[in-house]
Amino acid sequence: MIMDNFDSPFLYNRPEITVDSLKKSIVYKLIFSIGRSPKEASQRDWLNATLYAVRDFVTEGWITTARQSRSEETRRVYYLSMEFLIGRTLSNAMLAEGVYDVAKQALSELNVNLEDVLEKEVDPGLGNGGLGRLAACFMDSIATLALPGVGYGIRYEYGMFKQEIEDGHQVEKPDAWLDKGAAWEFIRPSKRHTVRFGGGIHFEGKKCIWTSKEEVEALAYDQMIPGYANDSAATLRLWSAYAGDRFDLADFNKGDYFAAVQDRTLSKNISRVLYPDDSTWSGRELRLRQEYFLVSASLQDIIYRHKRIHNTMENFADKVAIHLNDTHPALAIPELMVILIDQEGYEWKKAWDITRRVFSYTCHTLMSEALETWPVEMMAHILPRHLQMIFEINDYFLEYVRTYVSTDAEFIRRVSLIEEGDHRKVRMGWLSVVGSNKVNGVAAIHSELMVTSTFADFARIYPERFTNVTNGITPRRWIGVANPELSALFDRYIGKEWRRDLSQLTLLKDKVQDPELKKSIAQIKYNNKVKLANYIKNELGVEVDPNALFDVQVKRIHEYKRQILNVLHIIARYNAMLENPEKDWVPRVFILAGKAASAYYAAKQTINLINDVANIINHDERLQGRLKVVFIPNYSVSLAELIIPAADISEQISLAGTEASGTSNMKFALNGALTIGTLDGANVEILDNVGQDHIFIFGNTVEQVESLRRHGYRPFDYYQNDEELRKVVDQIISGRFSPTDANRYHQLLQSLQYHDYYQAFADFRSYVDMQQNVDAKYQDQNAWIDSTLQNIVNMSYFSSDRTILEYAEKIWKIKPVK
């Protein structure tokens, strides 16, 4: 074989997709890359050998894609995100390359079970929640659509944390995901960039000079993201922090060994963990350093790539699109300005014109308190030149506002990039809007509320800047990998093209009354529930009945996501079952999972309460096993792949107007779970697609939520007036579920009784009543399977391929390279 993508040809042997060839390749990698003989190899050795062998199939297409993206005519997007929750790589790569069955047979002939090997792969600790998983789905779609795009993130050494549950409490342990090696990645020793911090600035005439105090080296590691069946792959470049050559030999020779390596250790802290505890000033400082580290290394890399191809910055905005996934990378805006002015010698207005044409920004929240702000004092200490640039951008922007929009002092105060007060702050959401050419929301209702509430003032200034691109998920991961039986069913009924074109699911609409299809769907769901039930028994020691309704809420633990509302209903159901033991109750298993931020007390209390309630309910023999509660620790992509296909009910119960979109709602529905949810985020569009008979909508609307707030929401009134709610709350407060510590949940419940910012009490009655409708439908299994099928066949809109094509056309202005 000749690699013809270079000026002169190089001969090499391309791996063949045959059992014999792959078997030889795996053994070769085992011996010569890992240094193990087949007789001595552990399952993890076989995993890494298989990863190396499968990686060979992807690499050629990856190199070819990168070369085509470097064409002078190509415009390329660079996707900056603090998180990429990519999940396990081997199973996804084997399916993308069409070698899953071949690999399974090859390993079998080597007396190795592929499923056992796959279980040894750890999830990369590169993200936490929906933000990171969305970024991963997007990279998968960019690769499958052969779009010229590169992802940039941080290679966290210990992820966020490994969650363990001890006596019901969340305990955070290091997530040492790199300890066993990362066979899928390529280290790039030549791709190093220096990131500067601290020091001070001074002016020489009009020129601002930044004299930094500290330097950190960013070293690149590349992950390949394979496209599905297209011999293409995208690059995810992750930065790891090093101190470079800052080893103090003088200190070492004097015997001060700790001082000799102190700077190196401090530098590496930048890429140690995702989202360090921000309850302290030093923790906040580290977060700010992380964000700038990502931005600085990535922009240096982008500019280096661009200059290598074009040898000029004049066409930078024509050839480069940089996308900010939330506000975390917003420092890229002043960073590019600093580079263009201080290093490239551009005039301020020209630099600003280039900058605004380059950037676009996705807003992932409706809550203004969730939009990042940084203390001016902190930024002055860590990034003095960038703070000065933000002041300059703000002056320029406010002058524009005064000239063309309004001179009203209150309006000017609201839109200023600097929040005034005793402690001045930089508003990163505001900076992202002002410095971008497009700003998008991630669901129809979110985008509408974004321009009428969160960014209403900016929508007045830049009405053409705001748009909507509803989120999506990759069917290759969330059906292909997660639900192989459902994949096989789709293949049998509509062919295999649905993996690249999810609209093919509409072909099933004519078959939804087919008795064989209904029977198969029910059997697949049952089989997935058995798998999950076995996991729960083996890992947690809790026996659950796969014939019961599996009611699932798995997501980051946060007050706005309202896991507490779920718990209130569980206790209410428990009480009702004890009061009416003869009633024909639908057996239910409530399954919850998710991590709470280490400094988020209320969220950690909620996890504790879930586990305390589970402990009481699961040991109450009066229930005869008809009600179980399970909290599954350390939620991850691989656990999601196990849990989601097994769900009957998907809990999407955030307060209306707080969830930007959500994507777990899409994953559950595509796998045949019915949604119980509020009119929030993408739930609204799921309702539009599946129809009101196939989803359970409850709770106040956005307008009703706002009306309650305006007129003075009094949660204690709901507590007093609803006997069922009052009993539940009183039980928790009295220590019914925490007999060893009766006061454990006083603070949590008093916060609900007297504040309840996310209005759990207001929606309680509607929620509990709707759960009765869930029971009624589940008792009619024919109607339930009808609704399951209607959810599946109407989910094609929620493919991340559709989402990315919209980004490519509306925002990034890029085209496929193949």
From Swiss-Prot:
Reactions accelerated catalytically: [(1->4)-alpha-D-glucosyl](n) + phosphate = [(1->4)-alpha-D-glucosyl](n-1) + alpha-D-glucose 1-phosphate
EC top class, as a word: transferase
Known cofactor(s): pyridoxal 5'-phosphate
Domain of life, per lineage: Bacteria
Protein name: Glycogen phosphorylase
Family listed: Belongs to the glycogen phosphorylase family.
Alphabetical list of Gene3D superfamilies matching this protein: Glycogen Phosphorylase B
Disulfide bonds: none
Task performed by this protein: Phosphorylase is an important allosteric enzyme in carbohydrate metabolism. Enzymes from different sources differ in their regulatory mechanisms and in their natural substrates. However, all known phosphorylases share catalytic and structural properties.
Keyword Transferase attached: yes
EC number: 2.4.1.1
Residues bearing PTM N6-(pyridoxal phosphate)lysine: K667
UniProt keyword Hydrolase, yes or no: no
PROSITE patterns in UniProt: PHOSPHORYLASE
Keywords annotated in UniProt: Allosteric enzyme, Carbohydrate metabolism, Glycogen metabolism, Glycosyltransferase, Pyridoxal phosphate, Transferase
InterPro entries in the record: Glycg_phsphrylas, Glyco_trans_35, Pyridoxal_P_attach_site
GO CC term (a single one): cytoplasm
One GO BP: glycogen catabolic process
Species this chain originates from: Pasteurella multocida (strain Pm70)
Entry GO MF terms: glycogen phosphorylase activity; pyridoxal phosphate binding
